[in-house]
């Protein structure tokens, strides 16, 4: 047996339907789209997830909720990312947000919040925020929480 003898199983490769290629193809002229109407045109249908035949859509009938965004620009709020105490167990000495970014535990541009899942080690932890449980566990283990000013 040679590589050139290999063939796919019968029926495994279905041929692509080529439409609009003349009457002999069986899919010429209207190219399987039928006659006239919106669905036969290029651009086709309106989005069926939103368009309801011209009546007031469900989305438009529901009330607006929350903030709709500001005209000059979006209000930028600081984004926090939580890191659990159990994830800090592999570090020694001082733990900073920069160190956690390099270690892949904190996304760049996010503020660091230490959460209390897991056991604490006696570390100096520098963060933007601490949960109550994380603060208690860290102090009980002899660690030093340092709050960063934002």
Swiss-Prot record:
Keyword match Iron-sulfur: no
SUPFAM superfamilies: Ribosomal proteins L15p and L18e
InterPro entries from the UniProt entry: Ribosomal_uL15 (IPR030878), Ribosomal_uL15/eL18 (IPR021131), Ribosomal_uL15/eL18_sf (IPR036227), Ribosomal_uL15_bac-type (IPR005749), Ribosomal_uL15_CS (IPR001196)
Alphabetically ordered keywords of this record: Ribonucleoprotein, Ribosomal protein, RNA-binding, rRNA-binding
Matches recorded under Gene3D superfamilies: 3.100.10.10
Region (Disordered): 1-60
This protein's GO CC annotations: cytosolic large ribosomal subunit
GO molecular function, one term: rRNA binding
Stored HAMAP family: Ribosomal_uL15
Function: Binds to the 23S rRNA.
Protein name: Large ribosomal subunit protein uL15
Organism: Thermus thermophilus (strain ATCC BAA-163 / DSM 7039 / HB27)
Lineage, uppermost ranks: Bacteria, Thermotogati, Deinococcota, Deinococci, Thermales
Gene name for this UniProt entry: rplO
